[in-house]
UniProtKB/Swiss-Prot annotation:
CDD domains, sorted: RRM1_hnRNPA_like (cd12578), RRM2_hnRNPA3 (cd12582)
Residue spans of biased composition, Low complexity class: 319-333
Domain RRM: 27-110, 118-206
Region feature Disordered, mapped onto this chain: 1-25, 196-218, 319-373
Protein name in UniProt: Heterogeneous nuclear ribonucleoprotein A3 homolog 1
Entry annotated with the keyword Repeat: yes
Signal peptide region: none
Length: 373
């Protein structure tokens, strides 16, 4: 297929010729806001100042060959990516551009994947995990502003999750793009922390993409169909009424549940994390956050139940850390492809994923307890 075609935008999972510890997704930057005069050569000339580029492309309309206003550069190692991001702001052909770490195909389908935020949600916090464990881990990615370990106001017991706010959105992008996180010896989920308003924005943006052009393939349709379902249709999706991850979710609210979950800010249950608490009776399955019975991504729903079997790779997120079962899938955006359903160079909120560059911050509100450090 010619350079810049639709299907060659996605790398192979083995990422041949490079250290497997540094998959292509981690070495790739999305460059938004390009001048329509910018070419592959002028883009390369600028960004190769910070390292060796293994690929560089300005995305163009396949019919008119006109620039879509964005492109991608891929470095030979993550260290070069970090150096490039540390050199912001970047100006190419007289225009200030916006570099962001590329988002994988599966992550692009998740709420807020392209929103710009400085706060992360950390799930799976165990009772023996203290603030300094979170700080030690998070400081390796960037400068921390605050850490909030969420607790039950009455008992003082940890709720099982925390929030970390950094001074730079790129630190958040860097940490969430990685698939595995182990804090104080425990497997943890790390994702962007979105306010209720940001969740609504993300849902609306995915809804505009709608239909069969989204990333989840058959039946996924986040933001469209039945109430913005993040999963295979039906009730109980992300932000719907039953648990966190799709058709069989439990917990009467759960993470993101109807009115009393993570983005319910107090709601009916009055707790930040839903009536039975974060991971209560079914954060993606029956009991608990990652217990072997259902677990994170367990059968029948789970987190990101967007393939036909209704789970992410068929594996549990349990103490053995088999997140997604066998191996990571696509390593992230390559040349070409439709990022926001109907078009990849769309107007309004941005050309990439229909939502890059929006908003900031997250969390807040709700009748929960927490210690801020």
């Amino acid at each position: 297929m010619p350079r810049g075609g639709m299907d060659d935008h996605w790398p192979s999972s083995d990422d041949q010729g490079h250290d497997p510890k540094e998959p292509e997704q981690l070495r790739k930057l999305f460059i938004g806001g390009l001048s329509f005069e910018t070419t592959d050569d002028s883009l390369r000339e600028h960004f190769e100042q910070w390292g060796k580029l293994t690929d560089c492309v300005v995305m163009r309309d396949p019919q008119t060959k006109r620039s879509r206003g964005f492109g991608f550069v891929t470095y030979s190692c993550v260290e070069e990516v970090d150096a490039s991001m540390s050199a912001r702001p970047h100006k190419v052909d007289g225009r200030v551009v916006e570099p962001k770490r590329a988002v994988s195909r599966e992550d692009s389908a998740r709420p807020g994947a392209h929103l710009t935020v400085k706060k992360i949600f950390v799930g799976g916090i165990k009772e023996d995990t203290e603030e300094y464990h979170l700080r030690d881990y998070s400081e390796s990615y960037g400068k921390i502003e605050t850490i909030e370990v969420m607790e039950d106001r009455q008992s003082g017991k940890k709720r099982g999750f925390a929030f970390v706010t950094f001074d730079d959105h790129d630190t958040v992008d860097k940490i969430v793009v990685q698939k595995y996180h182990t804090i104080n010896g425990h497997n943890c989920e790390v994702k962007k922390a979105l306010s209720k308003q940001e969740m609504q924005t993300a849902s609306a943006q995915r809804g505009r993409g709608g239909g069969g052009s989204n990333f989840m393939g058959r039946g996924g349709n986040y933001g469209g169909g039945d109430g913005g379902n993040f999963g295979r249709g039906g009730g109980g999706g992300f932000g719907n009424r039953g648990g966190y991850g799709g058709g069989g979710g439990r917990g009467g609210g759960g993470y993101g549940g109807g009115g009393d979950g993570y983005n319910g800010f107090g709601g009916d249950g009055g707790n930040y994390g839903g009536g039975p608490g974060y991971g209560g009776r079914g954060y993606g399955g029956s009991p608990g956050y990652g217990n072997q019975g259902g677990g994170y991504g367990g059968g029948g729903g789970g987190y990101d139940g967007y393939n036909e079997s209704g789970n992410f790779g068929g594996g549990n997120y349990n103490d053995f850390g088999n997140y997604g079962g066998q191996q990571q899938s696509n390593y992230g955006p390559m040349k070409g492809g439709s990022f926001s359903g109907r078009s990849s160079g769309g107007s309004g909120s941005g050309p990439y994923g229909g939502g890059y560059g929006s908003g900031g911050g997250g969390g807040g509100g709700g009748s929960y307890g927490g210690r801020r450090f």
